[in-house]
Amino acid sequence: MPETGQEPPSAPPPPPPPKESFYIKNLLNGDPPKAAPKQPRALFAPSGKADGSGFALSQVGDLSFPRFEIPAPRFALSAHCLERAQTWWYPYALTPAGAHLPRTEAAEKSLLRDSSPASGTDRDSPEPLLQGGDAEQKERDPKSPAEIVLEESDSEEGKKEGGAEDWKKREESPEKKPCRKKKTRTVFSRSQVFQLESTFDMKRYLSSSERAGLAASLHLTETQVKIWFQNRRNKWKRQLAAELEAANLSHAAAQRIVRVPILYHENSGAESSAAGGGGPGPQPLLTFPHPVYYSHPSVTSVPLLRPV
């Protein structure tokens, strides 16, 4: 008889669940099955060749990074455009293996030639529109090249002629400096001048009432009469100064003339003896019947010399 106290054998306990590790390495490598190590690619590798999408960050060296996919419609560029988009001044080029190599001159020339606007790319302006516009312009203005050349030559000749005329004008006319406008000079008639001169001889200065009466009688303005008298007084003063200078010169010339007395006279004793004896007495050596004048500024007087 089986023992009632014995219990049937229990099932073995289930195995404990695997412990989840929260290390950064395990989080980065989230996929439990380890894939075969891939060959390292460049940091920025165009993923369009493999996946048909935009750029993706891939593994570099031994470190692995999560791949951030960029949708293709937002950033879809071909490999050719990416190669051309490299900065021209950057002296290194990225190789597929991720190594930096210096660019050669041939590579720089090719990049510059590709980036020049003369290179035929898909982004160039459409030629059919320009051709159509040129055709319409030719239809509107149908001129041959010869006519265009003739028109240009005519315009150049006109410019040359105009330049020559301007040069002649500059030569003929002296440099005009900005000067104040000259006042017009009043022209007096003979009768007016005669009346003014007669009034000036009588009176050098006129009062305001006399000036007003004279101006009314001569049909002139008071300002004209006043200016005429001022000019006439200046002229009169210049004449007086000239006359005074001439008088001074004549007076100075008269002062230079000096009177020289007679040097020899007849002897009084000889005259008396000659009168008593009746014979002619001795004549003086020099006799001057009239006084002689000498012009000498320094000689003032000469003493009278008598014979011994």
UniProtKB/Swiss-Prot annotation:
> Which InterPro entries does UniProt cross-reference here?
HD (IPR001356), HD_metazoa (IPR020479), HMX_Homeobox_TF (IPR051300), Homeobox_CS (IPR017970), Homeodomain-like_sf (IPR009057)
- List the induction conditions: Regulated by DAN in inner ear.
Q: Where DNA binds (residue ranges)?
A: 181-240
Q: Keywords on this record?
A: Developmental protein, Differentiation, DNA-binding, Homeobox, Neurogenesis, Nucleus, Transcription, Transcription regulation
* Skewed-composition ranges (Pro residues): 9-19
| Protein family per UniProt | Belongs to the HMX homeobox family.
Q: What is this protein called?
A: Homeobox protein HMX3
